[in-house]
């Protein structure tokens, strides 16, 4: 059974053709909420969605699979919610607003993720992902909220607009990492007036 550990966004391991065939003797299950990607000699071979695979279905899916070492990357495929710590932002009328935000993300392009984010590491934890996200989201919220008044920020319509602008900006920033932001939601905006 292949699945991503609870605290990991993606893990990588190396195996051989013989080991994979041994796992497939009966069948190999890619767990729900997981995708398996296979790379051989730096070449992307294909991916496996959740489901059960046999030697025949495995080989049919990977037309160019050869003997030798194969790298398997197990990644979360479900939409993953991440709640970020509160961020203090100054509005255009000089009020400090504490903003809590939550975003939902999903793996979009494994090749970009491997090249630009995972790199030589064998794992990329959810904590690593949160650490990468926090400064980008903070900067985007500073920009989008900092150009608004306190009354604007507390308005539901403007809060939705801020979330939309933040999502577009974050997607642009993280597109090169192969990660898609499904939603960026402002949970609360509190200030001491």
Label each PLM-derived region with a short phrase.
Residues 1-47:
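N-terminal, positively charged regions that mediate nucleic acid binding
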